[in-house]
A protein has these predicted regions:
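Conserved alpha-helical positions within TPR/SEL1-like repeat arrays
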Residues: 2-10, 41-56, 87-102, 133-148, ...
Length: 453
């Protein structure tokens, strides 16, 4: 039954979901005979295999499947100890690290720490000299965990991720292991796009190069899902690109997202589809700001709404309200003010309950701008003042200057001259210190209006 389960686990023909269910059934049948007391080794092996099957399972709740995988791996480790079975122990530690990296339940930060511990334990046995392929693959997994790590210094974690990816590439060369090489190029691109150290322009260019390298192997025909993942990542890199023509970079990003959506369909990959729709919406908004095509903002709004429908069904409330916030901003930019206010007020209520001032402050600012635009000036002033108070608490001087400028402009309109002067002078000082000529020109124009008032 164990061998049959392994055959189904690796099977290429037939539906992948069906094969995994058959593998799980076979492993469970073998466990009815192989008990930990009578056949400890034979019992432990299918536990590890069962963990792998649950990790990859398509049917059932993803969160439940990962919990079952973690239980199975830990049961296996009770028998397959480092001293008695070092190779098997290291393999299970690597598998356990993968399960913790993907885990949905529990605290995300803690899960990633557990993954990093498991990978490092695996590397105590999987050395480069003894097991080069396994060592390189575990370095890859460790790099991904460091890229996603929440604890510790973000900049340091990303440097550790880049080191791990480059170590992996010393073994996983394009000629010897093309699939793994492409995967590593994709992961390296992800680390560079987020990198804090080094020159930001060069980091983005390196990320684009890595993604383009990955796509030489990750083709639509050979590896459609991997191809879609890298297309989405490349789209993100073009969206952030500083070099080159802005309009051209935006067009390249849109093409990448649209390519990814050929594979990431709503039915087959709802979460990936939603995230790519969100990325596409962000980029369409940028094109709308650049070219003013109404169809772009309308399409962006539609993409946000569709993406939000999927995210609403998940347990990720933070992501759902972030999508709502961006939808509210898009509605504002498109001139749909009533609907924009409705969405942003819903977000405001959530973040007030959570006492999340870093998310609440920009929402209050957007609402202030909306109320200002729609002529509800006193309400706008209150929201500007509330957002200003929070930005001061956060020490966000750039947004403090932005709010004091907007508030000063509003106060000129409602005749609060002394308050307007005070706020505009504060913003003027900040922009002088930062040599922001464009914003200074705006402030000086408003101060001239004040002098003639």
């Amino acid at each position: 039954q164990t061998n049959l389960g392994l055959a189904y686990l690796d099977r290429i023909r037939g539906e992948r979901a069906d094969n995994l269910e058959l593998a799980i059934t076979a492993f469970n049948l073998s466990l009815e005979v192989y008990t930990p007391d009578s056949f400890p080794y034979e019992w432990a092996r299918p536990q590890n295999n069962l963990g792998t099957a649950y990790s990859n399972r398509i049917r059932g709740e993803r969160a439940d499947n990962l919990e079952l995988a973690i239980v199975a791996y830990n049961l296996s480790l009770e028998v397959l100890t480092r001293d008695a079975f070092p190779y098997e122990w290291a393999r299970i530690q690597n598998n356990l690290g993968n399960a913790y990296s993907q885990r949905i339940r529990g605290e995300r930060a803690e899960n990633l720490e557990l993954a990093i511990v498991a990978y490092n334990q695996s590397l105590e046995v999987y050395t480069r000299d003894a097991f080069p392929y396994e060592w390189a693959n575990t370095q890859n997994n460790l790099g991904t965990a460091y890229s996603n790590r929440i604890r510790g210094e973000r900049a340091e974690n990303l440097e550790l991720a880049i080191v791990a990816c480059n170590l992996s590439l010393e073994v996983l060369t394009r000629d010897a292991f093309p699939y793994e090489w492409a995967r590593e190029q994709n992961n390296l691109g992800a680390a560079y796009i987020d990198r804090i150290q080094g020159d930001i322009v060069e980091n983005i260019e390196t990320a684009i190069f890595c993604y383009q390298e990955a796509l030489k192997i990750r083709t639509f025909d050979a590896f459609p899902l991997d191809w879609a993942t890298t297309q989405n990542n490349l789209g993100n890199a073009y969206s952030e690109r500083i070099r080159g023509n802005k309009a051209e970079n935006i067009e390249n990003a849109i093409v990448c997202y649209q390519e990814a959506l050929q594979i990431y369909t709503r039915q087959a990959f709802p979460r990936d589809w939603a995230e790519t729709q969100y990325n596409l919406a962000n980029t369409l908004r940028e094109r709308f700001k650049l070219l003013g095509k109404v169809t772009d903002i309308q399409q962006a709004i539609n993409s946000y709404k569709q993406a939000r429908e999927i995210i609403e069904k998940t347990e990720d409330k933070t992501l759902y309200f972030n999508y709502s916030y961006q939808l509210g901003k898009a509605l504002f930019e498109g001139g749909y003010y009533t609907e924009a206010i409705e969405h942003l007020e819903n977000c405001q209520q959530l973040y007030q309950k959570q006492k999340d001032i870093s998310s609440l402050a920009p929402i209050l600012l957007e609402l202030a701008r909306l109320y200002h635009r729609t002529g509800r000036l006193e309400q706008a002033r209150l929201y500007f003042k509330d957002s200003l108070r929070l930005f001061r608490r956060l020490g966000d001087q750039d947004n403090v200057a932005s709010v004091t400028t907007a508030l000063g402009n509003l106060e000129i309109q409602i005749g609060k001259i002394s308050q307007a002067c005070s706020h505009l002078k504060e913003a003027q000082t900040y922009y002088q210190e930062n040599n922001d000529k464009e914003r200074l020109e705006e402030i000086n124009h408003l101060l001239k209006i004040l002098q003639s008032a």
